[in-house]
């Protein structure tokens, strides 16, 4: 059962961070977690999800392939973003010491490739609650995190040469999921291609 795999992988997700191997070689986080899980008799599905939580690790890296790995990766990255923002450590200019932009793009690429029609807002809110963010600070923090994510999505669409006005129109709707935005962009681009073909003919 996918839920059972996810719950178990979540329980074991960070256990390898306490080991000497990962303390010495931080780039092995997740890699060693997977190996330790297998050695301890965990299922291959649980072990793979533990590894996949860190994917993608860099631009062009592979994305998580398992359902549990995708969910764990999204949850982990959202938690990192919310925790860092809650401490006032918001990336500015070229400064991004915690690689929050990369993590956000990773989240978006997972969603774009999975076509999951989900909203990130409940995950952000749950993360704020688990981090004990004061209630009177949550609305502001939610707005900051959502704006940060939206800007990354805008950049992804710009790289695909989606017109500015189309992106602004789509992303002005805060209730629109990443999958919804992607579907509308594809439809609009397909329509634009049809128009160009007609003009050529």
Question: Where is each model-derived feature located?
Answer:
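Amphipathic alpha-helical "coupling" segments that flank catalytic cores
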Residues: 1-201
